[in-house]
Amino acid sequence: MGEYVKVGNLQVAKLFYEFMNDEVLPGSEVNKEKFWKDFETLIADLTPKNKALLARRDELQAKINEWHKEHRGNFDMEKYKAFLTDIGYLEPEVDDFEITTEGVDEEIAVQAGPQLVVPLTNARYALNAANARWGSLYDALYGTDAISEEDGAERGDSYNPVRGAKVIAYAREFLDQAVPLKEYSHKDAVQYAVVDGKLVVSVEGGSTTTLKEEEKFIGFQGNPENPTAILLKNNGLHIEIQIDRNHPVGKTDKAGVKDIYLEAAVTTIMDGEDSVAAVDAEDKVLVYRNLLGLVKGDLTSTFTKGGKTITRALNPDRVYRTADGKEITLPGRSLMFVRNVGHLMTNNTILDANGEEVYEGIMDAVVTSLIMKHSLLGNTRYLNSRKGSFYIVKPKMHGSEEVAFANELFDRVEDMLGLKRNTIKIGVMDEERRTTLNLKNCIYQVRDRIIFINTGFLDRTGDEIHTSMEAGPMIRKNDMKTSVWLQAYEKSNVTIGLAAGFQGRAQIGKGMWAMPDMMAEMLKQKGGQLKAGANTAWVPSPTAATLHALHYHQVNVAEVQNELRKERKDYRDEILQIPVAVNPQWTPEEIQEELDNNCQGILGYVVRWIDQGIGCSKVPDINNIGLMEDRATLRISSQHIANWLHHGICTKEQVLETLKRMAKVVDEQNAGDPNYRPMAPDYDNSVAFQAACDLIFKGYEQPNGYTEPILHRRRLEAKAKYAAVQQ
């Protein structure tokens, strides 16, 4: 642990104290002395409440464990529901209401589109994500498996015109679907021009045509008769046809089209939670400093690619002229949210009056809000919100009393920083069972500031397993995806969100496509999330955002939501169906296959987290398919093995043998990484391997099955160990 400064009754890490005083507070219109005094008061007031909420989690879990032990073999759903109601796990539902959130940006309230999630510890990734508001469709198609490599269309080191032709044909087909012409096809176009306020398209043979729906033409760049860009709009998202007859692609195109740019990631979650490994003041300052750079617009990242030095910075806005000569400006960057941590963890960046670590969620709320305040005061190169709001995603809350606590925290932060009430908007992750079952009540507690609810398979299943740990052995992990409770959870989230008036006001989000290399498959499947009522869904990369944007042109989300709003089904009984395997008949091979898969996934993620502080990366699975993993993958996998161990489906010796065997596989998969520390054969001396063992063998007693306590402890151990070796 580094040096501390005594500030009132707080002890504040010197590194963090200087960062706040020198970089964050100046220009914030918040007095330095008052800030630290108010911060101390806030910590003193809210710490006991935070502790009480965590104690309540443990109390409920203990009662549920006992109930399952007493009723093993004679489970009765009605008795189970009555029990959950008696202990306050199932809350009495509030009356119908609609949210009243005001000052919400169009990217949330009006536009349906992809959402990126990116670790704040990596400046380059964060900048790429912020800039993924617009993406090249040609690049996204050419560089991925979205276009097959059959018939001579291979991706190679140099440009392949056969592949290029397939890309162009695909893109023209997309234009014909999204912005069709009255007659002919975009494939026939030889020129795009603006004549008498309309987009006029000349085709081969001398004929001209216009758009079938002329209102989809928004503007252009360049001269009307020879524009360099045509701006169109469909289902609320923009499309930019770029024209340059001197460009290598443009000069081979009849109409001179060099590319088609799509409005893609309309929102991005800058993440300080599950995709980062931030365990001390040094890490937290990196998270906060990168956020400050993004908000102020001065963050840059310099790196070498192909022998060239490249500097990334935020993209400027895009300016066009409308048909009647007016200028319009569109944002060049994604609207940024920031994800804080949940209520569980503490961090040694600040020690309170009792010398105890402060709750990280309280610290995050104060610091990220103060950073975002700069965008309201105009201390920034670019505007993030045009409505004077900022957006904090709050994860891993259990039930409405925890959401009410987040609301109280945000109220207090607004008062402390001189912000109008409900300036801080909240996104509530629906990823814990008690929140799912009481979602309407959770939303009610933040009805004046909520802008987002979201489902996620991994964390939610982790909590499902842990909550019902004593109910019996769980079904296999892959079978969870088609289980009754999970389908009901996904539908219930949409139904409750729409009934609470989210349409036109807030986002209803769906989970991550975790396979960034499998874009053809994503194009086939991910549109289903929009048909299920989502108006945003998570993607793992800017390229994936561009391709996922195609789904929003194919599916009119507003129409889907209009239909779904008519449904008012209560899914609670289905959500309560515990995914326990009834008389499992798994063969030894099937059990081993499940263990191999889970152990390999745990080790592949943990080894980078513990040894290198990487909280999100493309981790090869057991079949060498790259999966974009964050901490949620650990929770489901470690809890699944812990459950099977607890019920005797496998033995500790078998799991340990599997871990050791899989460690060798993971070592091999990472052989090309010069910073990698192998786990085999000295398993006892590998902090990462020991962390993986802890996650499984101590999984039963982890609070709600969370992985953070073990990860943080082991990462701090690894940092100290490797620092000592370097000295």
UniProtKB/Swiss-Prot annotation:
Its cofactor is Mg(2+). Gene3D superfamilies: Malate synthase, domain 3, Malate synthase, domain III. It is found in: Cytoplasm. GO terms for molecular function: magnesium ion binding; malate synthase activity. It catalyses: glyoxylate + acetyl-CoA + H2O = (S)-malate + CoA + H(+). InterPro entries: Malate_synth_C_sf, Malate_synth_sf, Malate_synthase_TIM, Malate_synthG, MS_C, MS_N, MS_N_TIM-barrel_dom, MSG_insertion. GO terms for cellular component: cytosol. GO terms for biological process: glyoxylate catabolic process; glyoxylate cycle; tricarboxylic acid cycle. It holds the Pfam family MS_TIM-barrel. The modification Cysteine sulfenic acid (-SOH) is found at C616. Glyoxylate binds at R339, E431, G456, F457, L458, D459. It comes from the Bacteria. Pathway: Carbohydrate metabolism; glyoxylate cycle; (S)-malate from isocitrate: step 2/2. Acetyl-CoA binds at V117, R124, Y125, S275, R312, P540. CDD domains: malate_synt_G. It is an enzyme of class 2 (transferase). Mg(2+) binds at E431, D459. Its EC number is 2.3.3.9. Keywords: Cytoplasm, Glyoxylate bypass, Magnesium, Metal-binding, Oxidation, Transferase, Tricarboxylic acid cycle. Involved in the glycolate utilization. Catalyzes the condensation and subsequent hydrolysis of acetyl-coenzyme A (acetyl-CoA) and glyoxylate to form malate and CoA. HAMAP family: Malate_synth_G (MF_00641). Monomer. Belongs to the malate synthase family. GlcB subfamily. NCBIfam families: malate_syn_G, PRK02999.1. This is Malate synthase G. The gene is glcB.
